[in-house]
Amino acid sequence: MPGKWIFALLLLQISFCLRSAKCGKVLVWPMEFSHWMNIKTILDELVQRGHEVTVLKPSAYYVLDPKKSPDLKFETFPTSVSKDELEKYFIKLADAWTYELQRDTCLSFSPLLQNMMDEFSDYYLSVCKDAVSNKQLMAKLQESKFDVLLSDPVAACGELIAEVLHIPFLYSLRASPGHKIEKSSGRFILPPSYVPVILSGLGGQMTFIDRVKNMICMLYFDFWFHMFNAKNWDPFYTEILGRPTTLAETMGKAEMWLIRSYWDLEFPHPTLPNVDYIGGLQCKPAKPLPKDIEDFVQSSGEHGVVVFSLGSMVSSMTEEKANAIAWALAQIPQKVLWKFDGKIPATLGPNTRVYKWLPQNDLLGHPKTKAFVTHGGANGVYEAIYHGIPMIGIPMFGEQHDNIAHMVAKGAAVTLNIRTMSKSDLFNALKEVINNPFYKKNAMWLSTIHHDQPMKPLDKAIFWIEYVMRHKRAKHLRPLGHNLPWYQYHSLDVIGFLLACLAVIAALAVKCFLFIYRFFAKKQKKMKNE
């Protein structure tokens, strides 16, 4: 019997290979945390379709665990950065962003945010140098003859490895700070008059003041903020590739940009042929819950349950804040499942159970779930959209503020500030979202939009990866604007030329006028003298 199953799986993989022309070899340069969870969903599907997937794993990565992905091949290489260093940095980043970073305007981010990003840049440059300078690793990759590389541009270096190996590469990306990478390297069209800048915390139709804030954010990220220190990265890329180049220019050679978002979360804006939206690719129908959790959910009766999770990256929550949250949860008639890894609050009510881990997707897909209290991570937001669950957003850091702002603008959530939130604020927010049908209606509307696509998000991602492998590249989809320097892209040379022409014409017109004036003035004077 097992032999029959193995044979059936082999036939299934062969059928996928025939359908996609051939089975390819995919190299992956990943990022940690939720970035890895998203890209792993794509990789698992590629393996199911018969492709060979190899993941480059820096030894400093501490979340990415090869043991949990037996179907994937891993090439682990040593790094000068240790796991402890990287873990401490990300904890510091998350805590500083959550509790210290001012959010009045984007200008208030500086210099704290810039300092943190400089440290981020230094860590990843070190990891990149360790990979590219590892002759044994690079020789092995050359011999493997990969067809394509899949990377997350938030962790730069994948594009450099692809260039060294002379293979095409694609990006999988949620968003970069201020859309900096998308605009400078992808030539995305994102007018600040109606497209909220990532990390602005804005959403929906903007007022005049909102547009002023949005413009300040755009200018800040375009001219002052640097996610990667170009002074270090550009010379390194130039040295390795043996020609003058920059990090931004190399990133711009991506064949496709697979953006982990969609119009259920985003607001409409112009897009490009080599960009597709795959938000919610990790979402799937709910599976049965473990018996103990199912029994607790069923005990809620007609009131239902609330799912509470603020993610896994925030390491510290004060005892006072935890008690305030527990008190608010204890006041509602719903049962509550709270993902929490701290000291059990003294005010925890009998209706609330605390778990270190929850089957979040399966809970959100349960018919008794009434609301989701979330930090606003894209994965959790998309699972809520997928299942049509309204949200109470308590954003912590990164684009979480933007995700929740978008959900608020679309009428599927309310938002609270983790720093100023009182127990009554949370209690009132829970009552509002659970009892007001407005939020459930809009959440279901977003769910309908998400499900009503010509192709599932995961299938779109696989299609484009296989498309690039079939055609070797996708240059015919890349806008010619990639070949232009910034001043030509914005037509500044043409504008300058036209202004110069106008200036010359104006000068000639003035000279002609003066010549005619003087001619007639002299003639009139001569006539008077006669």
UniProtKB/Swiss-Prot annotation:
Catalytic activity line of the entry: glucuronate acceptor + UDP-alpha-D-glucuronate = acceptor beta-D-glucuronoside + UDP + H(+)
Signal peptide residue numbers: 1-23
GO CC entries: endoplasmic reticulum membrane
Pfam families named in the record: UDPGT
Keyword Phosphoprotein appears in the UniProt entry: no
Record's note on what induces expression: Constitutively expressed.
CDD domains: GT1_Gtf-like (cd03784)
Root EC class: transferase
EC annotation from Swiss-Prot or TrEMBL: 2.4.1.17
Top-level taxon: Eukaryota
Membrane topology: Single-pass membrane protein
Protein name, UniProt field: UDP-glucuronosyltransferase 2B37
Protein species of origin: Rattus norvegicus (Rat)
